[in-house]
């Protein structure tokens, strides 16, 4: 049966290859989380021979796969649009969703390719800070940022009490009135001078602009002045008015409770603190350690009595004892002993045996004897035992049975031996040698059989061990 050539799954000549690259920052879909961040870019197949022939025209004779012509082209050359001669058979919806490659007939979604239209500025450049002059900024702010602000101009300076001046109401201008809400009193509304009906005040305004009638905006303003709420907190150096939330009755009560609680932790109220177990290291030559030792020695010196300050014991019967001692004279023998060498702490501790210290007496070890060699044999002298049997060898010889020793071969030959005795002695020697040969042959055969048996057991053991390996 003839072998049929199998059609390849991918035809290399008609196949289209792609490069998987990151999506461009100027692509509008780069900020879309649902769109893939990597796209496919089709590779451009160029014939190597044609490319090399084109390179030779421009004087490039390198024989490698690199395209040197890309450096010779103009970066922004003229572009020409050539319309397609074959009309598209796909609908507009199909063009948006898929991309068709006629060489393979494979349809891929458009989301896996880069967008056709790109923005002029990428996402990273949009997020970068803008440098240069900003025309949309206030000129005064720009001048202050550029250090062109005139601090010597009195109009640019603020008064020390600008907060108080800003909080004082003026007669000719409109005044903002604050009205507490019925629920919690923290809602305020802006009211004009003419809208007196909205605030519920019944008193008329005076000509001088003085608002003193009960229920008037002036009286409402006095209840909520800024400097009345300026109260420092014990917990921080900031005031309560620096809080974002306006302080109503409940918040004020909450603040007062906190202030009362923190009064217990003032410097004058804090008592002795608990002793904390601190661990650490300190240098031996530290000044702090030296001060502590000096204080300790001073305290001990005050509580102890020195020997040179001892006073004699005052006896009450001193007068009577002096009379008796004057009558009796005693001879006292004073023995002066030589001062012994005292042991210090280090020498005492050195007598204790531990893992690293093994105290013992230092002994004088004599030098080993020098080894002398024999001039004849080269063997060390006085090393090998002397000739003759040792005591152990003599004891072993006595334990040997005399029947096991050869009889004829060890018997001395007498000088007065006759021919018959000589013939009998030689015949006995022959018989003894014959028995010795038989015994030697039997021993050799026994050793040979034992060697075979042991080799067979060793082979079986080796096979069993190899069979147990995993």
Curated annotation (Swiss-Prot):
Basic and acidic residues bias spans: 414-437
Keyword set, alphabetical order: Coiled coil, Phosphoprotein, Ribosome biogenesis
Annotated segments matching region Disordered: 23-54, 75-103, 166-209, 399-437
Coiled-coil ranges per UniProt: 414-470
Taxonomic path: Eukaryota, Metazoa, Chordata, Craniata, Vertebrata
Name of this chain's protein: Protein LTV1 homolog
Pfam families: LTV (PF04180)
GO CC terms, sorted: cytosol; nucleoplasm; nucleus; preribosome, small subunit precursor
GO biological process: ribosomal small subunit biogenesis; ribosomal small subunit export from nucleus; ribosome biogenesis
InterPro entries recorded: Ltv1
Function comment: Essential for ribosome biogenesis.
Domain of life: Eukaryota
Compositional bias ranges of the Acidic residues kind: 176-195
Phosphoserine, modified sites: 17, 24, 243, 326, 403
